[in-house]
Amino acid sequence: MVDSLKAAGRPVVLSPILVHKEPDPATHKDRETFVPKVFADAGVPFVLQPAGFGFTADGQLWYQAARCVREGVSREAALAAITQNAANAIGMGEALGSLAVGKWGNLAVLSGDPLAQTTVVEKLYIEGKPAYDRATDRRVKELTTGQPQPVTEPKQDAAKPDAKADGK
């Protein structure tokens, strides 16, 4: 089956449950197979997806990618599974999944290693435009200082006039 998937040339979207368990017929003990490693070893690109229960680490993409590395998948393959392979799987590889001239320019600037639990998003750019800056996030300031922060209205984008100004 892995060979036919490889021949198809498309990434395989994996279940959030990354370990397949089945009883060994001889010992009746569970055998565990780390599914991403099977595909990585065969050269089949794969995509990781978060679990619907993202409150635990194993439901988070960074954790799934880090677990892949821990289980012997190359760091490059693990990162591709949450970036370029995902974009390719939905037919958007020409626009998303990596940074290159002509692509949309979606980028997360992180505080450290993307596979580390302590890493946070510092800045976020969508289509090359700033979309988030942790340094100006009122909620982060409240959490880190313990002091309430004033609520400020977001700046109106000059290219998008206010609906009230249009009389609507």
Predicted regions: what is each one?
Residues 1-4:
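Beta-propeller domains
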Residues 6-11, 15-110, 119, 130:
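His/Asp/Glu-enriched, well-ordered alpha-helical/loop segment
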Residues 114:
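Small/polar (Gly/Ser/Thr/Ala-rich) solvent-exposed segments
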Residues 117-118, 134:
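Short active-site-adjacent structural elements
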Residues 123-168:
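Extracellular/periplasmic ectodomains of large secreted or surface enzymes and adhesion receptors
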